[in-house]
Amino acid sequence: MTPLSPILTNFYADHNNHHWLVTRDPVLCCTILMLSSRYHVLPGAGGESRNFFIHHRLWQHCQQLVVRLIFGQEKSSHTRIRSIGTIEALLLMSEWHPRSLHFPPESDGWDSDLVLAPEHQESEGSSADRWLEDMIEPAKRSDQMSWMLLGSALSLAHELGIFELDDKKCDYTSVYEGSISDDQIKLRRQRVQRLLYVYINQLAWRIGCVSLMPQSLSHAIAGRQISRALSQPGDEWLAFMDSWMDLTKLAKSVTDTFFPSVSFARQQFHSGRYIDLLDHFRTLLVRWKDDHLRPQGRHSPFQSSGFSLIPSSMNANIF
């Protein structure tokens, strides 16, 4: 699963560093195990049922850790929960969801949903309503969960000083003292900045909400360059992230131009003025594709998994 996600570095892929994963980043450790247990079936008899049980127990523990994070219920003053690894864990959970998201939650008390019985209407729209409930609602729940997790990740990033230019104001290194090198911590911090920018802005446009990230901070992150001296040999993450950042900025420009408000968008479509704007953005999209998808025939795992989501019809119409 790691090659399909741009969130984690290769540091914890080394077995020699698993001790630090367990002791320094407990939330990230539990999240990795929880997500892996959903998609990896254990060998032997009863592997699928054991896999289901392990995933459910790990998800319960992840929920407890998130509750501790939100309500500040750390068991000691030297907490391991408020760290860069927890931000990475929240990003992972917003990208790879637990199985129980689409099942009714366990209830140990009064639930108003049990009192309000659904209205049964025998009408022509019943099949459409059923389709909405079966197909659209699960996707909506996924987006809602991701939105809340990303909000928590952004809040924790501000608390730790992830976006501060002055390292003296940062509070994200104390957890890793004596275990992880300063260069590795700095690299993870810079990666988290860009990942939050991309994930929050793209999800905000998809669900029709205002981005949680202030405009000034978005410009600052987009303008910062990650030092390639910190990257690992052969790491294609920087090239992929540069292309993703450029595409995100371009998508934001399209959204701000075409859809600043419902009335303005309707006026644009009725007047036909949007045709000239389409030609303008088509040129920019072609330039982006030439810069990031065609040179040297390079295709990283990130590009294959991320940009393959662009529909072929969109490629034909835009590119």
Residue ranges and their predicted role:
Residues 1-87, 92-93, 97, 163, ...:
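Acidic, Ser/Thr/Pro-rich intrinsically disordered transcriptional activation regions
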